């Protein structure tokens, strides 16, 4: 159990740091478009979880520590629903209703599409 906990923890640290770096970069370069950091990590995370899920279906012998470290740890640290929700509320509160609705729609449907695309890539 300890190796599994370590794998998830290390993956979580890496994913969280990547999300933090992405947010800092976007805020430094595109402060008016703060929401694009969350959108980017969530869409990329959805693509990656689709790819990993498909690969692990093909290769079930991949150790649970690797699977959990990547899917639960890394992708769990990288992606975030709470930040997506806060970004949407911030856009709504600033009166940018069409942008908020578009952002929410792209996040949800883009995430679903990216997950499907990632899984489909493993079936080529």
UniProtKB/Swiss-Prot annotation:
Q: Which residues bind Na(+)?
A: 76, 79
Q: Which Gene Ontology molecular-function terms are recorded?
A: fluoride channel activity; metal ion binding
Please state the protein's primary subcellular location. Answer: membrane
How is this chain's activity regulated?
Answer: Na(+) is not transported, but it plays an essential structural role and its presence is essential for fluoride channel function.
Query: Which InterPro entries does the protein's record reference?
Result: FluC (IPR003691)
Provide the reaction this enzyme catalyses.
Answer: fluoride(in) = fluoride(out)
Q: Where in the cell is it found?
A: Cell inner membrane
Which BP terms in the Gene Ontology apply to this protein? cellular detoxification of fluoride
Annotated membrane topology is: Multi-pass membrane protein
| UniProt entry keywords in alphabetical sequence | Cell inner membrane, Cell membrane, Ion channel, Ion transport, Membrane, Metal-binding, Sodium, Transmembrane, Transmembrane helix, Transport
Membrane-crossing residue ranges in chain numbering: 1-21, 38-58, 69-89, 99-119
Q: One Gene Ontology cellular component annotation?
A: plasma membrane
State a single Pfam family of this protein.
CRCB
Q: What does this protein do?
A: Fluoride-specific ion channel. Important for reducing fluoride concentration in the cell, thus reducing its toxicity.
Which family does the entry's similarity section mention? Belongs to the fluoride channel Fluc/FEX (TC 1.A.43) family.
Query: What HAMAP family does UniProt report for this protein, alphabetically?
Result: FluC
Q: What is this protein called?
A: Fluoride-specific ion channel FluC
């Amino acid at each position: 159990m300890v190796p599994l906990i370590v794998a998830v923890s290390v993956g979580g640290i890496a994913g969280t740091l990547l999300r933090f770096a992405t947010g800092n970069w976007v805020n430094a370069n595109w402060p008016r478009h703060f929401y694009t950091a969350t959108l980017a990590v969530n869409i990329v995370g959805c693509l990656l979880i689709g790819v990993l899920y498909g690969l692990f279906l093909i290769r079930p012998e991949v150790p649970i520590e690797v699977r959990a470290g990547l899917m639960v740890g890394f992708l769990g640290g990288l992606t975030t629903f709470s930040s997506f929700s806060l970004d949407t509320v911030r856009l709504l509160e600033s009166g940018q209703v069409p942008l908020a609705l578009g952002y929410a729609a792209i996040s949800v449907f883009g995430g679903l599409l990216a997950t499907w695309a990632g899984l489909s890539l493993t079936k080529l």
